[in-house]
């Protein structure tokens, strides 16, 4: 049986720019309330007692991170990220070589709920592979004609899930799978896809659909609404 209740390290790839936000400032440094999106995302991880360290992979030319309180936080380590997400995650994993389990969380996903995080972390009691937070697809899904704004066909939504983060895996397994997948030229869109490529089947842990990733300008107001609602609920 897998080890239980071990301390967990987290990796947050934050070297991207996010051009779809249509701003000069990288999206992770946009503010919601009195904190940046990155700060909201990291603090949600550190709020759980099992998460003892967070490694943030930033762009080598990043001058904004040093201005944040996170830069002096005793549980934060900063590493240089790479050109692609997988490169940044690997850099983060190298910084926590002794960790047994690691979370990987999007820098621009600030609305993580603690009950979702707790359910995800609990899978380490019985799993040797790990899993991800995910939300069942509820809308009707259409596949488009290649290169056209026209419907090709309807996709059966049964058993379809939206992949969320955090994603949670044994550190050595994730490192080995990412390294192999990249070396063999596989397309890696998230950490789970690297494990899938290597023949593993991570668990799906249902999470809240409001755990959104801020990708487009309209997402900022929505994330602010969700965060404000959560704060009010916690104070009630």
From Swiss-Prot:
Pathway listed for it is: Isoprenoid biosynthesis; isopentenyl diphosphate biosynthesis via DXP pathway; isopentenyl diphosphate from 1-deoxy-D-xylulose 5-phosphate: step 2/6
Annotated CDD domains:
CDP-ME_synthetase (cd02516)
Site feature location: Positions MEP for the nucleophilic attack: 157, 213
InterPro entries linked to this entry: IspD (IPR001228), IspD/TarI (IPR034683), IspD/TarI_cytidylyltransf_bact (IPR050088), ISPD_synthase_CS (IPR018294), Nucleotide-diphossugar_trans (IPR029044)
What superkingdom heads the lineage?
Bacteria
Question: Per the UniProt record, which EC number(s) apply here?
Answer: 2.7.7.60
Which Gene3D superfamilies does the entry mention? Spore Coat Polysaccharide Biosynthesis Protein SpsA, Chain A
One matching Pfam family: IspD
* Listed GO MF terms: 2-C-methyl-D-erythritol 4-phosphate cytidylyltransferase activity
This enzyme catalyses:
2-C-methyl-D-erythritol 4-phosphate + CTP + H(+) = 4-CDP-2-C-methyl-D-erythritol + diphosphate
| Residues under site feature: Transition state stabilizer | 20, 27
Query: What GO biological process term is on the record, naming one?
Result: isopentenyl diphosphate biosynthetic process, methylerythritol 4-phosphate pathway
Entry keywords, A to Z: Isoprene biosynthesis, Nucleotidyltransferase, Transferase
Which PANTHER family is this protein grouped with? 2-C-METHYL-D-ERYTHRITOL 4-PHOSPHATE CYTIDYLYLTRANSFERASE, CHLOROPLASTIC (PTHR32125:SF4)
Q: Which family does it belong to?
A: Belongs to the IspD/TarI cytidylyltransferase family. IspD subfamily.
NCBIfam families hit by this protein? ispD
Q: How does it assemble?
A: Homodimer.
Q: What does this protein do?
A: Catalyzes the formation of 4-diphosphocytidyl-2-C-methyl-D-erythritol from CTP and 2-C-methyl-D-erythritol 4-phosphate (MEP).
Quote the protein name from its UniProt record. 2-C-methyl-D-erythritol 4-phosphate cytidylyltransferase
Tell me the classification of the organism that encodes this protein. Answer: Bacteria, Pseudomonadati, Pseudomonadota, Gammaproteobacteria, Enterobacterales
């Amino acid at each position: 049986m897998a080890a239980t209740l071990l301390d967990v390290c987290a990796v947050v790839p934050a070297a991207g720019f996010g051009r779809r936000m249509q701003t000069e400032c990288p999206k992770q440094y946009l503010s919601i309330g009195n904190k940046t999106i990155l700060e909201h995302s990291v603090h949600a991880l550190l709020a759980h007692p099992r998460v003892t360290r967070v490694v943030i992979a930033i762009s080598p030319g990043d001058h904004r991170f040093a201005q944040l309180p996170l830069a002096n936080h005793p549980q934060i380590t900063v590493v240089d990220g790479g050109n692609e997400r997988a490169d940044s995650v690997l850099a983060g994993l190298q910084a926590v070589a002794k960790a047994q389990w690691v979370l990987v969380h999007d820098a621009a996903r600030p609305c993580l709920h603690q009950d979702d995080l707790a359910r995800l972390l609990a899978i380490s009691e019985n799993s040797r592979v790990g899993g991800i937070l995910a939300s069942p697809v509820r809308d009707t899904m259409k596949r488009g004609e290649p290169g056209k704004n026209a419907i090709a066909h309807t996709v059966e939504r049964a058993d379809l899930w939206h992949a969320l983060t955090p994603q949670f895996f044994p550190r050595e397994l994730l490192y080995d799978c990412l390294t192999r997948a990249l070396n063999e030229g596989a397309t890696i869109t998230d950490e789970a896809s690297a494990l899938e490529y290597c023949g593993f089947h991570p668990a799906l842990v249902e999470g809240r659909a409001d755990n959104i990733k801020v990708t487009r300008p309209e997402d900022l107001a929505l994330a602010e609404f969700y965060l404000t609602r959560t704060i009010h609920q916690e104070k009630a």
